[in-house]
Amino acid sequence: MREILHIQGGQCGNQIGSKFWEVVNLEHGIDQTGRYVGDSELQLERVNVYYNEASCGRYVPRAVLMDLEPGTMDSVRSGPYGQIFRPDNFVFGQSGAGNNWAKGHYTEGAELIDSVLDVVRKEAENCDCLQGFQVCHSLGGGTGSGMGTLLISKIREEYPDRMMMTFSVFPSPKVSDTVVEPYNATLSVHQLVENADECMVLDNEALYDICFRTLKLSTPSFGDLNHLISATMSGVTCCLRFPGQLNSDLRKLAVNLIPFPRLHFFMVGFAPLTSRGSQQYRNLTVPELTQQMWDAKNMMCAADPRHGRYLTASAMFRGKMSTKEVDEQMLNVQNKNSSYFVEWIPNNVKSTVCDIPPTGLKMASTFIGNSTSIQEMFRRVSEQFTAMFRRKAFLHWYTGEGMDEMEFTEAESNMNDLVSEYQQYQDATADEEGEYEEEEAEYEQEETY
């Protein structure tokens, strides 16, 4: 069985993560004590992807929960599904990282990391054939960003050939809870570019907009935002957990989506998103799903795909539908909007179909796109970073934990390189082949070292 090991870190990661487990528990018919109460053998057929089987038929999530302060974990533990997790898999410190990346990455986090790795190792050894890891964290705080990236780099060392997928919540343009977010995010991206295989980019502001505009919620809570994220997370992996006509796994996803190794930051979207009131007035059809899924307002990060071009994209449809219709609709989108796709990657949109829809829906779809417009997010964070770094504002919090200014400069230039790489491929046309072949050769050389 192709298992996935789920890791959640920091306040944001633990809140998204616990919401995700609520969704997956529902889909697999597992109740709050870990007993199976479902009604279809399909729910159990590949339940091992996310669960270990314990004695007397209990299912236990293959999840590691970490944080540098006990608060969030206590609330996970006292929440509706708190008793389903294995108690040993809660790893927490007492000090907190105080929104400081250096504390999470170098001091406080470094003290806790070995006990986290012990739990990860234990879970990985129990796996039949571990496919990869999925990490939930935010990039604005201290623990999820600093300690999260530390863990990712340690796992990279120990399991170099396993997939590493992250769900990373970026700081939002207008909503900010700490002033040092640009520092933390830039230092994290510096790590993610090198050590992660695929990053699903999320941000609170885009999620707020979806709740507000599309779902018509007047005062969206973090619970509502996290519910959106968890729907997407469950959609990304549904092919692994349920039988389908066109299956995919984390590696196939990466192969189809990543044309150049550093460009692995994806926009995600989900359909159908309808307000509660108007649900019964709509009939879900494949064309409608497709239309909503490609809609710029549906993207869960604050970058507008219309400002760039898609290098590649992947769509996962769930429910009983005709694959032929899915393919026709996807082709239709590409033909009508051909200027938004790079022409030097033919057939760059892949679709997969999984027979089992999410709980409470007839059909649904998840969208993952590798668009050059994601540079807007990096550019925005980079501008904020530069504004503060130029004056060395707040730097003493980081240098006090033993960091060097050099590291900031490196992270800044790595992020700016990433932006210009996206820009370069956005402007590229199919007839400049010569230049690209040379560059690809350089890339391959870098890869082999």
From Swiss-Prot:
Sorted alphabetically, which Pfam families does this protein's record hold? Tubulin, Tubulin_C
Give the binding site residues for Mg(2+). E69
* Coiled-coil regions, chain positions: none
The record's keywords, sorted A to Z, are: Cytoplasm, Cytoskeleton, GTP-binding, Magnesium, Metal-binding, Microtubule, Nucleotide-binding
User: Region entry Disordered: which residue ranges?
Assistant: 422-449
**Bias (Acidic residues) ranges:** 429-449
GO terms in the biological process aspect are: microtubule-based process
Q: Which GO molecular function entries does the Swiss-Prot or TrEMBL record give?
A: GTP binding; GTPase activity; metal ion binding; mRNA binding; structural constituent of cytoskeleton
One GO cellular component term:
plant-type cell wall
Residue numbers binding GTP: Q11, E69, S138, G142, T143, G144, N204, N226
Q: Where in the cell is it found?
A: Cytoplasm, Cytoskeleton
Other comment: There are nine genes coding for beta-tubulin.
Cross-referenced PROSITE patterns: TUBULIN, TUBULIN_B_AUTOREG
Cofactors that this protein relies on: Mg(2+)
Name the gene. TUBB7
Family membership noted in the UniProt record: Belongs to the tubulin family.
Q: What is this protein called?
A: Tubulin beta-7 chain
- This protein's source sits in the domain of life called Eukaryota
Q: What does the function comment of this entry state?
A: Tubulin is the major constituent of microtubules, a cylinder consisting of laterally associated linear protofilaments composed of alpha- and beta-tubulin heterodimers. Microtubules grow by the addition of GTP-tubulin dimers to the microtubule end, where a stabilizing cap forms. Below the cap, tubulin dimers are in GDP-bound state, owing to GTPase activity of alpha-tubulin.
Organism this protein belongs to: Arabidopsis thaliana (Mouse-ear cress)
- InterPro entries xrefs: Beta-tubulin_BS, Beta_tubulin, Tub_FtsZ_C, Tubulin, Tubulin/FtsZ-like_C, Tubulin/FtsZ_2-layer-sand-dom, Tubulin/FtsZ_GTPase_sf, Tubulin_C
- Entry annotated with the keyword Nucleotide-binding: yes
